[in-house]
Amino acid sequence: MDSYIIQSLTDARQVLNQAQKHPESPVLRQDHPWEGNLIQTGAVLYDGDAKLFKMWYYTGQFFARLTPDGPVTETVEGSRKRAYAFSRDGVRWEKPNLGRIEFQGSRDNNMLPDDSPPPSYWDPHETNPARRFKGLVWTDDVCAPMTMDLYYSPNGFDWTPYEGNPVIDTSPRTGRWRPTVFMGWDPIRKIYAVHMESCLHRRCPLGKRVIGRAETPDGIHWNEPQTLIVPDEKDYPDTEFYAMAAFTHADLYLGLISIYRTTNMRHYPELIYSRDGIFYHREYREPFFNNGEYFGDFDDTSIYIFAAPIVSEGRVWIYYIGANWRSPEQLYEKGEKARRAIGLATLPVDNFVSIDGGKLRPGILVTRLFSFGGEELYLNMEGHGVSPELRAASPRIKVEVIGPDHKPLEGLKLEDADPLTKTGRHRVSWGGKSDLSKLDGIPIQLKISIQNAKLYSFQFE
């Protein structure tokens, strides 16, 4: 992601690799009368024991009413519902009959009570099974001082309020803790965290939406939000930050920040990263995946990520709210075609950023000096196709090991290396030999030659 391990790059560059939308997106859409024209995520979790993806979501029916001053957004009274779905593969979702709410004379539906919050996070360190799920719910308007109540649940459905509510109270200030995306347990900082719009944008020092972070050791005692990310001189003047979903991978924090362009009312995600969870870097200022291409696509206007990405089975699963309207004018223009639904974008877990080598001649990556534990070196790579027009060489990655005296080690030079040519994760070898255990704990550098290929990551085992 960054240059932390990189000493130099020659004829090679770091490239952002976009997440790919699943071809069946939207994966959760309106197909019941109680779901209206709006579906948006409340929470998405992966249950490793049951091997199920679980989603709590909201529904509603919106329309634009024309007034002398222009269209205004309205909600059909009583249309806002809460519901639940699950999936075995993350793509095809089932909406079970929960039998909890009556709708048009029947309880055969997947609706949940209005006072049933979606889980804010699942707590891996909770010793009380009845409190394994935590839900935090706003109780006041965003334009007034806001409070938040804490609820506990053993299963994500049956909730008990914390007796000391509220656990968050922004008074006397006008509160602004949302859009709120809970990270849950932060394994690097060893604390629970949430990211949010940290002040009401009209009252922020910049007069814009910005992203903050708050932390708690127990879900009850929260610190004041700290503003982390604000638009800078490289951004367009109409750029604001609507929300951020953050998660950790290896020793990095990764964030999907929602870029909001107020002129065209469009939202799209940008990938950012941090090594301490506080100072974030925006090296790759381009969409991590794109809005819908065609007018009327369910996500042609806005992509909101209000659920932390899930890492499972070697892939990152990003469930997002896609909308083809943002403003009352857009809602009025789309009419019956206006909708919000839930899409899915994925990518392999190490493939966020790659080092791309040249097609005609190899690019060279030289790492900083480091020591490792393990016996063998593995690379995760992708081989590009041969380009007849450029007469490019076949994909090829080779590795050289440099000792603490900055000289290539005998038998581990580039000319000794067995070339890696196919997409996937491969063990590195030199003349058929891969054992590096004698170098365990010794400072070394790697010199990696990359031609017509992408290098995603390397790891010692």
Task: Give the ranges of each region predicted by the language model.
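Carbohydrate-active catalytic/glycan-binding domains of CAZyme proteins
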Residues: 1-461
